[in-house]
């Protein structure tokens, strides 16, 4: 359902992040396939999140192919637009 169905969607998140839970529910409710990567205890993933967010630990950070964007605070309209999925179920 994304712009390019061949591009994998990766969501970098933490266990205690309410915005991450909202984003995950949003994606699941719309049938969007994605891989979740927890950055806690994962120095490589945390480093990537810091690098793509100008040194800030912003979660969730979403990767689509080579493109990254932070969805923090959670914004359903932004996420729907970025992934070309319906805003409403």
Residue ranges and their predicted role:
Residues 12, 37, 41, 71:
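Small/polar loops that bind or transfer phosphate-bearing groups
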Residues 53-62:
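Structural micro-motif
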Residues 2-33:
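Local sequence-structure signature of Cys/Sec-based thiol-disulfide redox active-site neighborhoods
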Residues 47-51:
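Short, charge-rich, low-complexity interaction segments located
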Residues 64-89:
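Non-catalytic, surface beta->alpha helical segment in thiol-disulfide oxidoreductase systems
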Residues 32-46, 56:
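Thiol-based oxidoreductase modules, predominantly thioredoxin-like and allied folds used
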């Amino acid at each position: 359902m994304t712009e390019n169905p061949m591009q994998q969607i990766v969501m970098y998140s933490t266990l205690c992040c309410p915005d991450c839970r909202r984003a995950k529910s949003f994606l699941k409710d719309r049938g969007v396939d994605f891989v979740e990567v927890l950055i806690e205890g994962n120095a490589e993933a945390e480093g990537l999140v810091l690098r793509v967010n100008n040194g800030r630990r912003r979660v969730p950070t979403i990767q689509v192919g080579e493109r990254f964007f932070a969805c923090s605070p959670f914004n359903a309209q932004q996420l729907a637009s970025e992934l070309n999925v319906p805003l409403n179920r």
